C-alpha cells in the first residue's frame, strides 16, 4: 500500500520519525548521565532533547495518521496501526510529563521524571517495532510494484515499469 504523504518520493512519516526517535533516545542517555554524575548540564541537555523530540513527534504524527486513514478497515494493518498510533500518543505523553516536571529546575534530574522518560523510551521501542511490522511485513507505505531494480524515487517513473 503506497504512502499518501510523500516527501521527495518517500513516506513522510518514515523520514520524519527518525528525528524524535533519535532526540528522545539521546534525552534518555543525557538523563542517565545526569543521575549518575549529578552534573546540571547533563540534565539541561536531556530536557532540551526531550522538548525537541516531543516537537519532532508532533510533526511526524500527522503524516502517519494520514497514511493510516487509507488502510482498509478490518485489516491486520489497520489494527496494528491503531495500536502503533495510540502507543505513540502515550510515548509523547510520558516524555511530555517528564519535561513538564523538570521545566522549573532544568539542571536537576529527579527520579519520577527519569522513570517517565525510561518508560516512554521502552514504549517507543514497542511502537517502533509495530511500525516496522506495518512496513516490512504488511507493506504499508511501500510503493506498489516495488522491486530490487526500481528506478529512483526522484526519477518520476513508477516502480512497476522496472518489474519486468
Mark where each language-model region is.
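Short amphipathic, positively biased membrane-proximal segments
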Residues: 1-164
Amino acid at each position: 500500500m503506497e504512502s499518501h504523504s510523500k516527501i521527495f518520493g518517500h513516506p513522510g512519516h518514515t523520514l520524519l520519525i527518525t528525528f524524535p526517535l533519535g532526540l528522545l533516545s539521546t534525552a534518555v542517555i543525557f538523563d542517565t548521565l545526569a543521575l549518575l554524575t549529578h552534573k546540571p548540564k547533563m540534565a539541561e541537555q536531556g530536557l532540551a532533547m526531550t522538548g525537541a523530540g516531543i516537537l519532532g513527534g508532533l510533526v511526524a504524527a500527522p503524516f502517519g495518521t494520514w497514511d493510516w486513514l487509507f488502510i482498509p478497515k478490518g485489516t491486520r494493518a489497520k489494527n496494528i496501526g491503531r495500536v502503533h498510533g495510540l502507543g505513540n500518543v502515550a510515548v509523547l505523553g510520558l516524555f511530555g510529563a517528564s519535561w513538564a516536571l523538570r521545566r522549573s529546575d532544568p539542571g536537576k534530574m529527579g527520579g519520577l521524571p527519569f522513570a517517565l522518560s525510561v518508560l516512554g523510551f521502552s514504549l517507543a521501542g514497542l511502537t517502533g517495532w509495530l511500525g516496522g511490522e506495518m512496513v516490512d511485513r504488511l507493506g504499508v507505505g511501500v510503493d506498489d510494484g516495488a522491486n530490487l531494480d526500481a528506478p529512483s524515487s526522484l526519477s518520476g517513473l513508477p516502480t512497476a515499469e522496472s518489474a519486468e
